[in-house]
């Protein structure tokens, strides 16, 4: 009897794998000489209930995707519990999919836990006409608020951080810059959104601020532990209510700021007063929109998405950049030589600093803060480069793998800014902010922040490791791919 059960299980596993991998490509998609080549991508063995989840590391999922890519190809398939999934590990294929075929891939794949973070009314998880209108208004508001005042905002917040650092190094010149980068970004985003900022000295911060940070950390801990998103029989054991609770706690932190702006802003768009912050621009654009798709009540969800995206991507990238510059002091010195100019550069001067730009690009390439992007859904059957992607498939771009796809394997894990100074720069590329209609609308703002802060920070300070051992370049995956905590010694440059 036991032998029969085992045999039956093997037959069942065989049949579900045959059904999954041997999919018939619709005849309407079979054209030209490639009819016989076109197929659904291969992948690891599927098991009942869990699918291919046994192949994924909870600690390093991006590395699991890369290893599976090495075995099954740059585009492979797997079953994430009950969800049919295709993972893209090739930057050229990603461009052909998301950039060249946006109508097939512009929609977000909705995992159940996503609903409890704004009911799909924000910029990150939204879909359809609401999301398209929101993106248009957001992009328009960012464009209108991008000005010399924004650059002054970045510099003002940087100088506050520099003043804090100068005091700090006199007390204990053994500094973890990670929290400081996060505070710089949080202050820039809050000043940008609401016209307010926070102190750098933790002793001067309010209990509401600490409550926000605590809820923010808990929220992403819960999101990282949601097996019920993939395995339906585990739904009774989900903690979606905890996600909703911590998310609402985060919203409560800046709701008073939104209320204050709404109270003080005029209902008359032609009152002649210049908007004082981004949110005033944004509210003005909402009021002008005749479709009424975006509501004032959506503002907390939108603000949360902007703050989280900015902190996770930009501050983490700045932390990684510092790690590499302390590991490779010759690169740091070459950077200093380029940025040691009499004046503070503006964003319009960016092209005059090719080495700094290449360092930022290389940091995003080798250590992308979001090693794999949030999932998309393929909304109709499509064939790209002889690879069949069926309708309703979850599509995950493995940014970590894509950023290594056009570089020789011996060089792909080596930090080398010269990658982006060579004649092959356009062929190398990096896709930290993705491609197509879902490309981060704040990518240019993030780029401005990293450029402007770096031109001042690395001109004022030289950073050294506090030990002879190199800082760990592998990092760990929490809400983002982050470096392990490391400390630096700061030397004021004369």
UniProtKB/Swiss-Prot annotation:
Class of enzymatic activity (EC top level): oxidoreductase
One GO location term (cellular component): cytoplasm
Principal subcellular localisation of the protein: membrane
Entry superkingdom: Eukaryota
Topological type in the membrane: Single-pass membrane protein
Pfam families per the UniProt record, alphabetical: p450
Single GO term (MF): oxidoreductase activity, acting on paired donors, with incorporation or reduction of molecular oxygen, reduced flavin or flavoprotein as one donor, and incorporation of one atom of oxygen
Any one biological process term the GO annotation gives: organic acid metabolic process
Chain sites annotated for binding heme: 440
Keywords: Heme, Iron, Membrane, Metal-binding, Monooxygenase, Oxidoreductase, Transmembrane, Transmembrane helix
Cofactor: heme
Regions that span the bilayer: 1-21
Location of this chain's protein in the cell: Membrane
Catalytic activity, EC: 1.14.-.-
InterPro entries with a match to the protein in the record: Cyt_P450 (IPR001128), Cyt_P450_CS (IPR017972), Cyt_P450_E_grp-I (IPR002401), Cyt_P450_sf (IPR036396)
Protein's UniProt keywords contain DNA repair: no
Protein family: Belongs to the cytochrome P450 family.
PANTHER family linked: CYTOCHROME P450 307A1-RELATED (PTHR24303:SF31), HEME-BINDING MONOOXYGENASE FAMILY (PTHR24303)
Name listed for the protein in its UniProt record: Probable cytochrome P450 515A1
Organism the protein comes from: Dictyostelium discoideum
């Amino acid at each position: 009897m036991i032998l029969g059960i085992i045999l039956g299980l093997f037959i069942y596993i065989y049949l579900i794998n045959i059904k999954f991998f041997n999919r018939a490509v619709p005849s309407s998609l079979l054209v030209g000489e490639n009819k016989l080549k076109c197929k659904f991508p291969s992948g690891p063995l599927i098991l009942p209930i869990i699918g291919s989840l046994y192949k994924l590391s909870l600690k390093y999922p991006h590395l699991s995707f890369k290893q599976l890519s090495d075995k099954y190809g740059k585009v492979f398939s797997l079953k994430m519990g009950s969800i049919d999934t295709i993972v893209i590990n090739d930057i050229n294929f990603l461009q052909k999919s998301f950039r060249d075929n946006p109508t097939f891939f512009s929609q977000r794949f909705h995992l159940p836990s996503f609903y409890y973070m704004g009911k799909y009314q924000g910029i990150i998880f939204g879909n359809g006409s609401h999301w398209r209108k929101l993106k248009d208004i957001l992009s328009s508001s960012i464009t209108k608020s991008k000005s010399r005042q924004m650059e002054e905002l970045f510099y003002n917040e940087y100088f506050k951080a520099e003043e804090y650092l100068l005091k700090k190094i006199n007390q204990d010149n053994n500094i973890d810059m990670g929290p400081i980068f996060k505070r710089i970004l949080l202050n820039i985003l809050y000043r940008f959104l609401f016209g307010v900022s926070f102190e750098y000295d933790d002793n001067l911060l309010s209990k509401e601020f600490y409550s926000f940070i605590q809820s923010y950390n808990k929220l992403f801990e819960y999101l990282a532990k949601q097996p019920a998103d993939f395995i339906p029989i585990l739904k009774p054991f989900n903690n979606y209510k905890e996600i909703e609770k911590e998310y609402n706690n985060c919203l409560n932190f800046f709701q008073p700021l939104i209320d204050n702006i709404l109270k003080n802003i005029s209902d008359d768009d032609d009152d002649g007063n210049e908007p004082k912050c981004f949110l005033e621009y944004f509210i003005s654009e909402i009021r002008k929109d005749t479709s009424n798709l975006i509501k004032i009540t959506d503002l907390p969800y939108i603000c949360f998405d902007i703050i989280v995206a900015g902190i996770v991507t930009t501050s983490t990238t700045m932390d990684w950049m510092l790690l590499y510059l302390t590991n490779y002091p010759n690169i740091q010195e070459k950077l200093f030589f380029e940025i040691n100019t009499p004046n503070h550069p503006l964003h319009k001067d960016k092209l005059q600093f090719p080495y700094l730009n290449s360092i930022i690009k290389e940091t995003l390439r080798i250590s992308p803060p979001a090693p794999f992007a949030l999932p998309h859904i393929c909304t109709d059957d499509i064939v790209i480069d002889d690879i069949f992607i069926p309708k309703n498939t979850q599509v995950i771009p493995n940014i970590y793998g894509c950023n290594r796809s056009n570089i020789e394997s011996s060089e792909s894990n080596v930090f080398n800014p010269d990658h982006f100074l060579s004649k092959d720069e356009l062929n190398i590329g990096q896709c930290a902010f993705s491609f197509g209609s879902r490309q981060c609308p704040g990518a240019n703002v993030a780029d401005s922040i990293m450029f402007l802060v770096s031109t001042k920070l690395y001109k004022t300070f030289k950073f050294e490791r506090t030990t002879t051992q190199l800082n760990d370049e592998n990092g760990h995956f929490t809400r983002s791919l982050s470096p392990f905590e490391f400390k630096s010694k700061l030397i004021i440059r004369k």
